[in-house]
Curated annotation (Swiss-Prot):
Pathway: Sesquiterpene biosynthesis; trichothecene biosynthesis. Glycans are attached at residue 254. This is Core trichothecene cluster (CTC) protein 15. Part of the core gene cluster that mediates the biosynthesis of trichothecenes, a very large family of chemically related bicyclic sesquiterpene compounds acting as mycotoxins, including T2-toxin. The biosynthesis of trichothecenes begins with the cyclization of farnesyl diphosphate to trichodiene and is catalyzed by the trichodiene synthase TRI5. Trichodiene undergoes a series of oxygenations catalyzed by the cytochrome P450 monooxygenase TRI4. Pfam families: zf-C2H2_2. Residues 161-171 have a biased composition (Basic and acidic residues). Keywords: Glycoprotein, Signal. The gene is TRI15. It comes from Fusarium sporotrichioides.
């Protein structure tokens, strides 16, 4: 009995000695988020704009003109209506470079990719090395299609009578904005990973240039200012607003007398909004009717083909 007790005490002592001899493992004092910070990838460096650099491949030309010829022959990029551009070609291609290399978006459909090479491959593979200059496009801000013959004959005169400076160049307001010589501000929202739906929404919600009111000088400033507010004809309107007013007046003239009388109590802006909404709804109805008619014609052609197939004789005559 005494021997068993002695053996047990010896075993306990040996175990305590082993535990005390085990080296202490140092605690991990590294912050939990250090691995996350170290593993996070650095943002992709945006290449600076070079006039001779192709937007879709690594080929570099000596001048911008040679690069434009290469992009047109190799990739199909064409700049239409260059006479109506409000900026020089270098500034326009600088904005295209911003869209592709900074925001990694397709020029044609607005599809976003994670890298520049991916969006370049998308555009070359889909044939999207082009851009839209329609009214609802963001590239329409670089064009001015509404110059009248009088404005073209005046040459170097602005709307307010001041002389134009042909050497004026766009100003880079910040990394995402550019002010054109006409006073328009072209900006791109900082959404490098934006979805195509956000791109389409940005195109639809593109803001227009506010109206600029002329401020007369003289002793009767208050009287003239009140007259300008009451009469919109004295305001300096943009060409787009003039065109919208002319279109609304044309559509209003084509309405019946009853419809025009029903709109007389509304303001001019409300009339234009209502006419535009009605026009869009009419166009949508026409498209739906045409689509339904095509489906009906297609179904009729299938039934006619099946009918004549079954009417053929099973066995040849004779």
């Amino acid at each position: 009995m005494l021997g068993a007790t002695t053996a047990t005490a010896t075993t306990s002592t040996a175990a305590m000695t082993t535990l005390s001899a085990t080296p202490n493992v140092p605690e991990d004092t590294t912050p939990l988020n250090q691995d996350i910070v170290e593993s996070s990838k650095e943002p992709e460096q945006v290449a600076s704009f070079t006039p001779g650099q192709c937007l879709f491949c690594p080929i570099t030309s000596s001048t911008l003109e040679e690069s434009m010829v290469h992009m047109q022959k190799a990739h199909g990029l064409f700049v239409p209506q260059q006479d109506h551009l409000t900026v020089d070609l270098e500034t326009f291609f600088r904005y295209l470079h911003l869209v592709i290399f900074n925001y990694r978006e397709c020029l044609h459909c607005g599809t976003s990719r994670s890298t520049v090479q991916a969006v370049q491959q998308h555009m070359t593979g889909k044939g999207h090395c082009k851009f839209d200059v329609s009214e609802d496009s963001e590239f329409a801000e670089f064009y001015d299609f509404y110059q009248t013959e009088d404005e073209l004959s005046e040459g170097s005169l602005n709307e307010d009578g001041s002389s134009k400076d042909p050497d004026r160049k766009p100003l880079q307001v910040d990394q995402d904005s550019m002010r054109l010589p006409s006073g328009r501000l072209i900006s791109k929202k900082s959404s490098a990973q934006a979805e195509p739906s956000l791109f389409q929404a940005r195109r639809r919600l593109r803001t227009t240039v506010p109206q600029i009111e002329s401020v007369p000088t003289g002793s009767d400033d208050e009287v003239d200012t009140s007259n300008e507010i009451s009469t919109p004809d004295t305001q300096v309107l943009t060409r787009r607003e003039k065109r919208q007013r002319a279109t609304a007046a044309h559509q209003l003239a084509n309405m019946s007398a009853g419809d025009r009388a029903a709109l007389m109590h509304l303001s001019s802006s409300e009339q234009r909004s209502l006419i535009t909404t009605n026009h869009k709804f009419t166009e949508k109805v026409k498209k739906e009717e045409a689509r339904s008619q095509r489906r009906l014609d297609k179904k009729g052609n299938k039934n006619l083909y099946a009918y004549w197939n079954t009417e053929n004789p099973v066995y040849p005559c004779g």
